[in-house]
Amino acid sequence: MSNQVIIASFFILFLLLFAGVGIYSATQKQSNTGDYLLANRSVNPWLTGLSAFATAHSGGMFISTIGWTYQVGISSVWLLVGWFLGDYIAWFFVHKPLREVSEETNTETIGALLNHNIKGNQSISIISAIITILFLGAYAAAQLIAGGKALHAVFGWNYALGIIVGAVIVVLYCFSGGIRASIWTDAVQSVVMMFSMLMLLIIAIVTCGGLGEMWTTLAQIDPTLVNPIPANLQFGFGLFLLSWLVAGFGVVGQPHIMVRAMVLDSPKNMALTRNIYAILYVIFSAAAIGVALAARVLIPDLMNNGDPELALPQMAIQLLPAAWVGVILAGLFSAVVSTADSQILSCSAALSQDIFPQTAHSYKLAKFATLTVTIIVLAIALTSNKNMFALGVFAWSALGSGLGPILVLRVWKCPISPVVGVTMMIGGIVIAAVWNAVLGLSGSIYEVLPGMIAGFLIYGCSLLFREKEKA
């Protein structure tokens, strides 16, 4: 039996396992939008924590983060440190209030929550929905690109075929049971993701001759790879780290992740959910960095004659028996699908609930919206010429800058008028885009920092003008 047949057999075996979980979850579903979009707010903290981990740690961790670390070395650790701290702060100050407010207002989407109590004006929910579909759709496309790259590296498939396979699997998950199927499969996929990453890490370090030998070889390849401080930072290390901390806090602008807080069975269980998520986050992120550094030692030619974003699957092929390569590929694809299905469900919710609120309670139209969004995402993935890291990172910053500030203020029950809300969303995204594309400063300070600051400043200015009018 050829290696490719063995790899494909194990890969398909795990896909069937995930599909079986999704199909079983469908037996627990109810045919209404509340169950399709929020699982009737009945998910226990263990499932929620595992699902949040799998959704947040997408194919980007297997592909883009490893590819980036492969290029820059140990200094990439600050991206993950800052991201974790910001994310953890958000869990303390935003997730629990979001769970409480979403139930108080009986809202099923982020857009509906943002627009709650504003009668006769749907501008906030419509603009937030458009932002979600555009940028979260692009983010979902980045996941499909990651899946396409993995299948290309292992089987030699055309990128487009791998992308289409990923899209078909995502649609099947979404149609089987909505967010309940997504969460249940996330839980199983998170175990496969963690196991595959840790297994490859251990084998790679042993092959390098141990941590000490790996570190010495990295220094010989390029001394900057073992320099913990990034070079050429225009604004210094402090602002660089702060920008990535704010990037982590930018999770509050990611509907597909924040909805995990909304599905939790009780706000009282948020602390347990947060701790499960955080422990898995730290272990998995550290393992990903270790795998990337080992890959730079074992397959150094990807910088000149390959794609650094393919470091993980390429190293798996070189180091592991065919069956284990199938497991690694399943772990990578798990990360892709667990995020993409959540993103597509959030986009379809924005389309069916916020842009066309007259269809809000139609279960069939919610499913049709899912299919429509998947086709759009597939088109973006097939026509994009960006690498996954660039596409995913800018989509995250746009969502964090556009939706983050207004969501924070909403769950803290601050009054926001339609004009101010729309200005905050558009202003934040514009500033982030200018910082990235026009000024070219994202390498020194990630654009989500100025983008989110702009959103909060716009709100602050609106309060000053309101006080002046009262005076």
Give the location of each predicted region.
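Membrane-embedded helix-loop-helix hairpins and adjacent transmembrane boundary segments
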Residues: 1-471
